[in-house]
């Protein structure tokens, strides 16, 4: 069996089951309907994250919902963030505020991240998010650009493999960073052979992770803040994978 065949089998084993997808869609519909009643018809609600990018793996997934208010909404971003937070609390949801999201925890570690923002234009392509940090700030980005960055570069399956690799090796790195690393390592090459593509990514991580600057493809002014520990963990795991004798030691 070739590395590509082995990795293809792993990907097949991580496909989402129809019952799980139905639960996710039902939950999205429930939240969208609730927020529509609470917030009115102005905001648009989109799938974000792994569902929007089609990069879910069965063993570890969650749901991102983006709530973009129209550019005509005169409230501050802090007020918009607060309005969505208050609406969820009124609905008896358990809410854990994150940096740009309102996290709703469910069973078995599953959660929904609700991300409020305000669109910059009427096309809703770009939006500004509120950063719930100290001090508070804002972040301009684009969900649609992030989705296209994965879909149009055909990185979907590679990202799924990297998410499984992260899970197996306990690597503390967000999926968004993995997506950018994959795109940077492959530099426009089509990932037709999964083994070759993953090997190139591991080589790039092992060599460049200590100093690489990861920029948001939707806004190069947004640079991902990676800790020394995160950089070191990724580089060490990549080097370990490169020294493995079989793919079964790297991904299973």
Residue ranges of predicted features:
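A structural motif
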Residues: 115, 121-162
């Amino acid at each position: 069996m070739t590395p590509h065949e082995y990795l293809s089998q792993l990907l097949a084993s991580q496909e989402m089951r129809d019952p799980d997808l139905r639960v996710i869609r039902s939950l999205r519909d429930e939240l969208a309907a609730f927020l529509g009643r609470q917030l009115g018809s102005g905001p648009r609600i989109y799938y974000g994250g792994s569902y929007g990018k089609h990069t879910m793996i069965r063993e570890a997934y969650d749901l991102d919902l983006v709530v973009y208010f129209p550019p005509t909404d005169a409230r501050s971003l802090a007020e918009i963030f607060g309005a969505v937070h208050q609406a969820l609390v009124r609905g008896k949801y358990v809410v854990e505020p994150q940096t740009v999201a309102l996290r709703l925890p469910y069973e078995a570690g599953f959660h929904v991240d609700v991300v409020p923002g305000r669109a910059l234009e009427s096309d809703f392509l770009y939006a500004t998010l509120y950063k719930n940090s100290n001090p508070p700030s804002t972040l301009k980005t684009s969900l649609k650009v992030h989705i296209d960055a994965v879909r149009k570069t055909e990185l979907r399956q590679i990202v799924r493999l990297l998410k499984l690799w992260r899970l197996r090796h306990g690597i503390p790195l967000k999926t968004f960073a993995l997506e950018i690393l994959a795109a940077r390592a492959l530099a426009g090459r089509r990932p037709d052979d999964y083994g070759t593509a993953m090997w190139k990514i591991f080589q790039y991580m092992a060599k460049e992770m200590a100093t690489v600057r990861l920029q948001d493809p939707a806004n190069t002014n947004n640079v991902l803040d990676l800790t020394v520990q995160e950089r070191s963990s990724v580089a060490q795991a990549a080097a370990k994978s490169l020294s493995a004798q079989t793919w079964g030691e790297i991904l299973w």
